[in-house]
Amino acid sequence: MTALVLGGCAAGSRGTDQAAEVSTTAKSILPAEHKDIAKGIYELAYSAKQDAVFVAVSGGFSKVPGKPMVARLNPQTLEVEKEIPLRRKAFGVALDDAKNRLYVGNTLDLSVTVVDIQRNRVVRTIQLMGKKKSANGRPAYTHDLRELVVDSANNRLYVTGHSEKGSVLFVVDTRRNRVIKTIPGLGNAKAPGLVLDAKGGLVFTSNLLGEVVVIDTKTQAVTQRFQTRSDQPMNIAYDSATQRLFITDQGLKMITDYQAKSIEGFKSRHPGKRILVLNANTGEEIKSVPVSDGPLALRLDEQRKRLYVTSRAGAQVSVFDSETYALLHSVNLPPFPQSIALDEARNVLFVTVKADTSKDGLAEDSVARIQLP
């Protein structure tokens, strides 16, 4: 908290020209309330069934770390109603609301903790891969975890394991709570993005080679690879009605410097700071939408045709019309807004906000609550 039929992608200046057509001025500034929760919070999920917000808490990495847990919040007041203790640091989350399960990514331990959100307790920890002998002779994990996504109907959990030497997709049987397949080919680079097309039986991932890699969930193999005109494709949202992919193209200098060192022959294709919109079937670039600095998480509300995007460096949440790409509203938050969850019934957005740790590392991260119009 981040690969056989080859698909083409539109290039040239098309995306740049289209970006200029989109207004970067919001019609209104929406208010937000936020509350400090704990050190080292990352992703969160809203459960309509439990009417609760669940937040992954790593405990942070300061000299005085907090305790890893899942914090259960009241969605109205943001008060912590329950702390579900974990043995391993928590980062990403995926919710299976129908089955009362929250899957929590333990990035540093290459595992997933399964939480029963009805009983507020840990059910099991799934080890995705063991340690291997590293270059210094010591055992170490070869991959990091980032995103998780659940296919509830088919009892599957998909988790990206990314590595410069070859990113993979872990496939977990959620009935047996065990890994049944490790799919290679997600690219020799970090693979941060992950989204599921449940109806089409496809998983889409992104990597820092600027690719979108498509996996068939039935054959459990990579079927397409799209080279995009982006450098840092991060999180992905999928619009099932129009078969479009929305991807945050981050544009951070720190990542650009990392790419220059780790990717042979790396040349920048785009400065980022935008939402890249692609045809999910062909990889064709449909639109390039400018957004505030450091875009990361997205949440698509297909029914209302709204797209919500966090910008970490820009300290904002932006609200777009997902059809016209017009910027409708913005929400000013403290640095650094990160992950998004949505209560669709109440039309309320929840956002994790990372504290500035550059001073003493003792500040707690917060969760913001935004009532949408």
Regions found by a protein language model. Give the residues of each.
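Gram-negative bacterial Sec-dependent N-terminal signal peptides
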Residues: 1-10
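Predominantly soluble domains enriched in secretory-pathway, periplasmic, or organellar proteins
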Residues: 9-373
